[in-house]
Protein backbone atom coordinates (compact mmCIF):
# COMPACT_ATOMS: atom_id res chain seq x y z
CA UNK A 1 0.00 0.00 0.00
CA UNK A 2 1.01 3.61 -0.57
CA UNK A 3 -0.31 6.37 1.67
CA UNK A 4 -0.25 10.07 2.41
CA UNK A 5 -0.94 11.64 5.81
CA UNK A 6 -3.47 14.43 5.22
CA UNK A 7 -2.43 16.17 8.47
CA UNK A 8 1.15 16.52 7.20
CA UNK A 9 -0.20 17.72 3.86
CA UNK A 10 -1.99 20.52 5.74
CA UNK A 11 1.37 21.72 7.16
CA UNK A 12 3.09 21.76 3.73
CA UNK A 13 5.08 18.67 4.71
CA UNK A 14 5.81 16.32 1.83
CA UNK A 15 5.13 12.76 3.00
CA UNK A 16 4.82 9.24 1.67
CA UNK A 17 4.18 5.95 3.41
CA UNK A 18 4.61 2.38 2.27
CA UNK A 19 3.03 -0.63 3.99
CA UNK A 20 3.48 -4.31 3.23
CA UNK A 21 2.10 -7.55 4.65
CA UNK A 22 4.43 -9.72 6.73
CA UNK A 23 2.01 -12.41 7.92
CA UNK A 24 -1.74 -13.01 8.23
CA UNK A 25 -2.30 -10.20 10.76
CA UNK A 26 1.05 -8.37 10.68
CA UNK A 27 2.24 -5.51 8.45
CA UNK A 28 5.27 -3.24 8.29
CA UNK A 29 4.75 0.47 7.62
CA UNK A 30 7.49 2.94 6.72
CA UNK A 31 6.70 6.62 6.42
CA UNK A 32 8.94 9.52 5.54
CA UNK A 33 8.25 13.23 5.85
CA UNK A 34 10.17 16.24 4.60
CA UNK A 35 9.52 19.96 4.87
CA UNK A 36 12.26 22.00 3.15
CA UNK A 37 10.33 25.28 3.09
CA UNK A 38 11.24 28.62 4.60
CA UNK A 39 8.42 31.14 4.68
CA UNK A 40 8.34 34.93 4.76
CA UNK A 41 9.98 36.78 7.68
CA UNK A 42 12.44 33.87 8.13
CA UNK A 43 9.68 31.64 9.55
CA UNK A 44 10.93 28.04 9.51
CA UNK A 45 9.30 24.65 10.01
CA UNK A 46 12.02 22.67 8.23
CA UNK A 47 12.36 19.02 9.18
CA UNK A 48 12.61 15.45 8.03
CA UNK A 49 11.33 12.32 9.77
CA UNK A 50 11.58 8.58 9.20
CA UNK A 51 9.11 6.40 11.12
CA UNK A 52 9.17 2.59 10.77
CA UNK A 53 6.26 0.76 12.39
CA UNK A 54 5.07 -2.80 12.95
CA UNK A 55 1.29 -3.29 13.07
CA UNK A 56 -0.88 -6.08 14.43
CA UNK A 57 -4.38 -6.14 12.89
CA UNK A 58 -7.12 -7.62 15.10
CA UNK A 59 -9.29 -8.90 12.23
CA UNK A 60 -7.49 -8.80 8.89
CA UNK A 61 -4.61 -6.74 7.58
CA UNK A 62 -5.44 -3.35 6.06
CA UNK A 63 -8.93 -3.28 7.60
CA UNK A 64 -10.38 -2.52 11.04
CA UNK A 65 -8.50 -2.09 14.32
CA UNK A 66 -4.72 -2.32 14.69
CA UNK A 67 -2.09 -1.89 17.38
CA UNK A 68 1.37 -0.60 16.52
CA UNK A 69 4.92 -0.14 17.75
CA UNK A 70 7.08 2.48 16.05
CA UNK A 71 10.46 4.15 16.05
CA UNK A 72 11.10 7.70 14.90
CA UNK A 73 14.08 9.82 14.04
CA UNK A 74 14.99 12.95 12.15
CA UNK A 75 16.29 16.50 12.20
CA UNK A 76 14.63 19.91 12.51
CA UNK A 77 15.19 23.63 12.06
CA UNK A 78 12.24 25.53 13.61
CA UNK A 79 11.94 29.21 14.39
CA UNK A 80 10.17 32.55 14.20
CA UNK A 81 6.76 30.88 14.71
CA UNK A 82 4.21 33.00 16.60
CA UNK A 83 1.06 31.91 18.42
CA UNK A 84 2.04 28.39 19.47
CA UNK A 85 0.87 27.17 22.92
CA UNK A 86 2.46 25.14 25.69
CA UNK A 87 1.80 21.54 24.69
CA UNK A 88 2.49 18.39 26.72
CA UNK A 89 5.33 19.96 28.69
CA UNK A 90 6.94 21.69 25.71
CA UNK A 91 6.86 25.50 25.69
CA UNK A 92 6.28 26.04 21.98
CA UNK A 93 5.86 29.80 22.52
CA UNK A 94 9.69 30.01 22.64
CA UNK A 95 9.68 29.35 18.88
CA UNK A 96 8.50 32.96 18.38
CA UNK A 97 11.79 34.48 19.57
CA UNK A 98 14.30 31.71 18.93
CA UNK A 99 15.33 29.15 16.35
CA UNK A 100 16.05 25.54 17.30
CA UNK A 101 18.17 23.24 15.17
CA UNK A 102 18.75 19.63 16.20
CA UNK A 103 18.00 15.95 15.89
CA UNK A 104 15.72 13.50 17.67
CA UNK A 105 15.12 9.76 18.09
CA UNK A 106 12.38 7.94 19.91
CA UNK A 107 9.83 5.15 20.11
CA UNK A 108 6.15 4.74 20.80
CA UNK A 109 3.03 2.62 20.61
CA UNK A 110 -0.15 3.35 18.73
CA UNK A 111 -3.71 2.43 17.98
CA UNK A 112 -5.53 2.92 14.72
CA UNK A 113 -8.45 1.99 12.53
CA UNK A 114 -8.75 1.60 8.76
CA UNK A 115 -12.03 2.11 6.87
CA UNK A 116 -12.43 0.54 3.45
CA UNK A 117 -13.59 3.13 0.93
CA UNK A 118 -13.42 0.90 -2.14
CA UNK A 119 -11.49 -1.96 -3.70
CA UNK A 120 -8.22 -0.02 -3.72
CA UNK A 121 -8.82 2.85 -1.28
CA UNK A 122 -8.80 3.11 2.54
CA UNK A 123 -8.99 5.92 5.05
CA UNK A 124 -6.89 5.28 8.13
CA UNK A 125 -6.61 7.09 11.47
CA UNK A 126 -3.88 6.51 14.05
CA UNK A 127 -2.68 8.00 17.31
CA UNK A 128 0.61 7.10 18.99
CA UNK A 129 2.29 8.02 22.26
CA UNK A 130 5.85 7.54 23.40
CA UNK A 131 9.11 9.32 24.11
CA UNK A 132 11.80 11.03 22.07
CA UNK A 133 15.26 12.29 22.97
CA UNK A 134 16.37 15.51 21.28
CA UNK A 135 19.67 17.37 21.21
CA UNK A 136 19.57 20.92 19.85
CA UNK A 137 21.23 24.29 19.39
CA UNK A 138 19.27 27.43 20.28
CA UNK A 139 19.75 30.62 18.23
CA UNK A 140 18.50 34.20 18.52
CA UNK A 141 15.73 35.34 16.16
CA UNK A 142 14.28 36.88 14.04
CA UNK A 143 17.46 36.84 11.92
CA UNK A 144 18.61 33.65 13.66
CA UNK A 145 22.25 34.58 14.02
CA UNK A 146 23.91 34.25 17.42
CA UNK A 147 24.14 30.84 19.09
CA UNK A 148 22.56 31.09 22.56
CA UNK A 149 23.45 27.57 23.70
CA UNK A 150 23.01 23.84 23.31
CA UNK A 151 20.78 21.52 25.31
CA UNK A 152 18.94 18.23 25.25
CA UNK A 153 15.46 17.21 26.30
CA UNK A 154 13.33 14.09 26.64
CA UNK A 155 9.84 14.59 25.26
CA UNK A 156 6.91 12.42 26.42
CA UNK A 157 3.63 12.59 24.55
CA UNK A 158 2.23 12.23 21.05
CA UNK A 159 4.67 10.56 18.68
CA UNK A 160 2.25 9.89 15.85
CA UNK A 161 -0.99 11.46 14.63
CA UNK A 162 -2.26 10.46 11.22
CA UNK A 163 -5.24 10.56 8.93
CA UNK A 164 -3.96 8.62 5.95
CA UNK A 165 -5.42 8.27 2.50
CA UNK A 166 -4.28 4.79 1.43
CA UNK A 167 -4.03 3.15 -2.00
CA UNK A 168 -3.98 -0.66 -1.87
CA UNK A 169 -2.36 -2.63 -4.69
What are these regions (language model features)?
Residues 25-28, 62, 120-123:
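Repeated loop/turn-to-beta-strand initiation elements of outer-membrane beta-barrel proteins
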Residues 1, 11-13, 47-51, 102-108, ...:
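Transmembrane beta-barrel architecture of outer-membrane proteins
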Residues 22-24, 52-60, 112-117, 167-169:
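Outer-membrane beta-barrel proteins
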Residues 4, 18, 30-32, 52, ...:
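Membrane-embedded beta-strand positions of outer-membrane beta-barrel proteins
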Residues 6-10, 32-38, 56-58, 71-77, ...:
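Transmembrane beta-strands of outer-membrane beta-barrel pores
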Residues 3-17, 35-46, 61:
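Solvent-exposed loop/turn segments connecting transmembrane beta-strands
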Residues 155-169:
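Outer-membrane beta-barrel "beta-signal"
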Residues 33-47, 75-103, 135-154:
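Flexible, solvent-exposed loop segments that connect beta-strands
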Amino acid sequence: ALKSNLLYDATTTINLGFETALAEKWTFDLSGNWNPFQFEDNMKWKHWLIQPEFRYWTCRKFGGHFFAAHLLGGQYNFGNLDGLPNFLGSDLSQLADHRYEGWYAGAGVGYGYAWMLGKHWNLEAEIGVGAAYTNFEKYECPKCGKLVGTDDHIYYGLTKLAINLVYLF
